[in-house]
Amino acid sequence: MDFQKLAQELKKMQNTLSKKQKEFEEKVFDFDYKGYVLVKIKGDLNIEAIEIKTEIVDPEDKETLQDILRAAINEAISITCKERDAIMNATIPKGTGLF
């Protein structure tokens, strides 16, 4: 086995993964939660913006709004993480025994 060639391949794979991860972290994803809330979240899971439809804002029922916001943010995070994992898994060659 040529360890130098293997080391070069690993370095190349590491560079590719780092590049894809950085690109993903900078990308902004829009998630529309049931038409009530739009969450804009970056791949690094920082929330860029939250837009709320006026019709769901009821000053006398803040609990419902809080529940909707929590659900929207959790869904945005979950979907973003799944997309990140899919991209990373597609980048790592199968059968390498590395992961």
UniProtKB/Swiss-Prot annotation:
Gene3D superfamilies: Nucleoid-associated protein YbaB-like domain. Keywords: Cytoplasm, DNA-binding. Coiled coil: none annotated. One of its GO terms (cellular component) is bacterial nucleoid. InterPro entries: YbaB-like_sf (IPR036894), YbaB/EbfC (IPR004401). It is found in: Cytoplasm, Nucleoid. One of its GO terms (molecular function) is DNA binding. SUPFAM superfamilies: YbaB-like. It comes from the Bacteria. Pfam families: YbaB_DNA_bd (PF02575). Belongs to the YbaB/EbfC family. Binds to DNA and alters its conformation. May be involved in regulation of gene expression, nucleoid organization and DNA protection. Homodimer. HAMAP family: DNA_YbaB_EbfC. This is Nucleoid-associated protein UU088.
